Swiss-Prot record:
Residues 46-493 are extracellular. Its EC number is 3.1.4.1, 3.6.1.9. The keyword RNA-binding does not apply. It comes from Saccharomyces cerevisiae (strain ATCC 204508 / S288c) (Baker's yeast). One of its GO terms (molecular function) is nucleoside triphosphate diphosphatase activity. This is Ectonucleotide pyrophosphatase/phosphodiesterase 2. Keywords: Glycoprotein, Hydrolase, Membrane, Multifunctional enzyme, Phosphoprotein, Signal-anchor, Transmembrane, Transmembrane helix. GO terms for cellular component: endoplasmic reticulum; membrane. It is a single-pass type II membrane protein. Induction: Up-regulated during phosphate starvation. Autophosphorylated as part of the catalytic cycle of phosphodiesterase/pyrophosphatase activity. It catalyses: Hydrolytically removes 5'-nucleotides successively from the 3'-hydroxy termini of 3'-hydroxy-terminated oligonucleotides; a ribonucleoside 5'-triphosphate + H2O = a ribonucleoside 5'-phosphate + diphosphate + H(+); a 2'-deoxyribonucleoside 5'-triphosphate + H2O = a 2'-deoxyribonucleoside 5'-phosphate + diphosphate + H(+).
């Protein structure tokens, strides 16, 4: 159902009727009266039209307001969409002209736009930890999804991206949809589409509230076409009843990341040009769809990514090391219980954590023996207790965290443009793309942020951490008072 284009009624008409008694009127007075009437009519018509957005803040702070778009009443709408693996350098005047214009504060519809040169991802720069950071406002060590893959001692099971085990997910920080749906007693509805962690079903997990699940959610489908994704977003927005319609829509685009892992990022690659051009067209169609529905002036749209991508040369035998050459299988089975992740890092879980120091030293020695000093120096073997506090990971603030036991005992961390894989068969051919590096050491991990709509100023802000997205969603909801955000500051405060 298309909500047809009509002016958005953002103001009430409070004019009073006035009784005018008859009296003698001159021609000159009649002309003046007619002229005043014309001016008055024009002013009244103008007051009914949507006002242009200026360059100042336009936060809509009262959720009790409804807005008429010509056919239906609406609450303010917030849309958050993440492009997995999208680095700022992919924003290009030639291949992504719409995103390029937005990033440079140029909009065809006079929208307020806030951008940053880049957004800072959390460590590890992987998909699931960072998407959960954006919807919880916490670092991975604080929200519980400490990596794309880890061992959960509580359930004695392995977490992977396709693991929807409610026992693991219920033991993580509360997402934004749980907060907003709980605070509104179900009146505020959230719809998600493929956002990592949003499709977990808790119905058989009796102690978990229903609000832990988005009111509407869609299952992951990596083959979904972008136009089908857009159609689903507008199906949510076009629901005829105000009480059924979600006020927050959250969606996820996996296409760019999937391509980058296989081929890396090179803007000379015509396949990559085509792919990011399709993503650009998706966002143009989204904004134009909102404009056709006369919803643009009451919609806040945020375009983000979880991390970037770094290219690794897998052909030269120098940039990729193989674990099975470092630690033989029989030795591994004797001391190591689990081995997780590949690429920029490897997480080693020991059968007996008391062995960690000498096994750490052994791995370091075996690396040098297998690959020589020059290559082995690109890989750093550390205990989890030795993470730099600036990474905001294991006990970064000198205190224990609830999810410390999900972090492996020993880590192998590669320098930028280097990677580690488990077996020879895992070594790709040619250039591969990977992510997981700490942003402080690898600018390729940077992500994007573009915010547009009435709650934003028209400006470029300094880079900020992606946990701030959570604060913006709270502000956009106009649901909670500042004292309930439990945050000392927000980018938009």
């Amino acid at each position: 159902m298309l909500l047809f284009e009509q002016p958005v009624d953002l103001e009430k008409n409070n004019e009073d009727d006035t009784n005018i008694k008859p009296f003698a009127i001159s021609r000159h007075f009649l002309l003046k009266l007619l002229l005043c009437g014309i001016i008055l009519i024009e002013l009244l018509l103008y007051s009914k039209c949507p006002k242009p957005i200026d360059n100042g803040p336009r936060t809509i702070a009262n959720r009790s307001n409804t807005y008429f778009n010509g056919t239906h009443d609406f609450k303010t709408l917030t849309i958050l969409i993440s492009i997995d693996g999208f680095h700022p350098r992919l924003i290009d005047a030639k291949y992504t002209p719409f995103l390029y214009n937005l990033h440079n504060l140029r909009s065809p519809y006079d929208m307020n736009i806030t951008t940053a040169p880049y957004m800072i991802p959390s460590f590890p720069t992987q998909t699931f930890p960072n998407h959960w950071s954006m919807v919880t406002g916490k670092y991975p060590i604080e929200h519980g999804i400490v990596s794309n893959i880890f061992w959960d001692n509580f359930t004695s099971s392995e977490f992977r991206p396709n693991n929807l085990d409610a026992r693991i997910w219920s033991n993580t920080a509360d997402p934004i949809w749980q907060l907003l749906q709980t605070e509104s007693q179900g009146e505020y509805k959230v719809a998600t589409h493929m956002w990592p962690g949003s499709e977990v079903v808790y119905e058989d997990h009796g102690d978990v509230p229903r609000e832990r699940m988005p009111f509407y959610f869609g299952k992951f489908n990596q083959w979904e076409k972008l136009q089908d994704k857009l159609a689903q977003i507008f199906r949510y927005i076009d629901m005829p009843q105000l009480k059924d319609r979600p006020e927050l829509v959250i969606s996820y685009i996996p296409n760019v990341d999937s391509y980058g892992h296989s081929f890396g990022y090179d803007l000379r690659d015509k396949r990559l040009q085509k792919l990011i051009g399709e993503v650009d067209g998706f966002f143009l169609d989204l904004i134009e769809g909102l404009q056709k529905r006369n919803l643009l002036k009451i919609s806040n749209v945020m375009i983000v990514s979880d991390h970037g991508m770094s290219n690794v040369n897998a052909n030269d035998g120098e940039h990729v090391v193989v674990w099975e050459r470092v630690f033989p299988a029989d030795a591994m089975s004797a001391f190591i219980s689990h081995l997780y992740n590949e690429g920029p890092m490897m997480m080693v879980c020991l059968k007996n954590p008391r062995d960690k120091q000498w096994i750490c030293d052994l791995i370091e020695a075996q690396l040098e023996k297998a690959y020589g000093d020059e290559i082995s120096r690109k890989f750093h073997v550390i205990l989890k207790e030795d993470f730099d506090p600036s990474w905001k990971y294991f006990q970064y603030d000198n205190r224990k965290h609830r999810y410390d036991d999900r972090v492996g005992d020993i880590w192998i961390l590669a320098d930028e443009y280097y990677a580690i894989v488990k077996e020879m068969g895992d070594v790709p051919i040619g250039i591969m793309g990977t992510h997981g590096y700490n942003f402080n050491n690898c600018s390729d991990m940077a992500s994007i942020f573009i915010g547009m709509g009435p709650m934003f100023n028209n400006e470029v802000v300094p880079p900020f951490e992606n946990i701030e997205v959570y604060n913006m969603l709270i502000k956009a909801s106009a649901l909670l008072g500042e004292e309930k955000t439990k945050k000392e500051k927000s980018l938009l405060q």
